């Protein structure tokens, strides 16, 4: 009987220790935010932009600021190089950006490493074979790194990618979800905002 209780106590202590490790190491109190909801004013943010020069991606020293382009509907997509679903939906976002140039579409990549890694990846990734090259994409690309993660979290991100936020002309969030979207899904969300 004592051996049985000893095993139970050890297992319980292990569960408590694992919970404490997860809590103190993986749940950063600065990152746990209330998040924004549909109908809220979108918080302003600025990210570095990634651009192609002669077909080669790099950081061009420019920035994207959400409210610099107030008066337009904006589609903000958060993705990462390791996210398979993100890469699957990227051609849909590109197709949407080409079809609706009056809508501003930006794909913001978040990585834990240096930003140059993203540009290198975009220059060599296999997706360029499917999409005729990242450089031919019509949407804008941005980057947020370890020091800028508040951009993702301040817009309601938790831990899942891809995430898309749609902001209307007045800066009000009209869509905010962590899920994949295709061209038709983007149309269903954005087109009613263009007809307001």
What are these regions (language model features)?
Residues 72-74, 78-82, 160:
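Short pre-active-site segment immediately N-terminal to redox-active cysteine/selenocysteine motifs
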Residues 78-95:
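Conserved redox-active cysteine motifs that mediate thiol-disulfide chemistry
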Residues 107-111, 143, 177:
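Residue-level recognition of beta-strand->loop/alpha-helix junctions
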Residues 121-169:
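Short, internal strand/loop/helix patches
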Residues 159-196:
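Thiol-/selenol-based redox modules, centered on thioredoxin-like
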């Amino acid at each position: 009987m004592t051996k049985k209780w000893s095993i139970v106590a050890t297992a319980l202590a292990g569960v408590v220790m694992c919970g404490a490790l997860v809590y103190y190491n993986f749940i950063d109190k600065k990152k746990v935010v209330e998040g924004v909801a549909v109908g809220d004013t979108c918080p302003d943010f600025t990210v570095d932009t990634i651009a192609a020069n002669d077909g080669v991606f790099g950081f061009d020293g420019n920035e994207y600021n959400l409210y610099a382009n107030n008066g337009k509907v904006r589609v903000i997509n958060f993705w990462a190089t390791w996210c398979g679903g993100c890469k699957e939906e990227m051609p849909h976002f590109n197709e949407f950006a080409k079809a609706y140039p009056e809508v501003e579409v930006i794909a913001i990549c978040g990585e834990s490493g240096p930003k140059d890694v993203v540009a290198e990846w975009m220059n060599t990734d296999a997706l360029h074979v499917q999409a005729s090259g990242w450089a031919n994409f019509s949407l804008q690309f941005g980057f947020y790194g370890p020091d800028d993660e508040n951009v993702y979290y301040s817009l309601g991100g938790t831990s899942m990618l891809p995430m898309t936020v749609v902001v209307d002309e007045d800066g009000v969030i009209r869509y905010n979800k962590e899920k994949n979207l295709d061209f038709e899904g983007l149309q269903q969300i954005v087109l009613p905002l263009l007809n307001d």
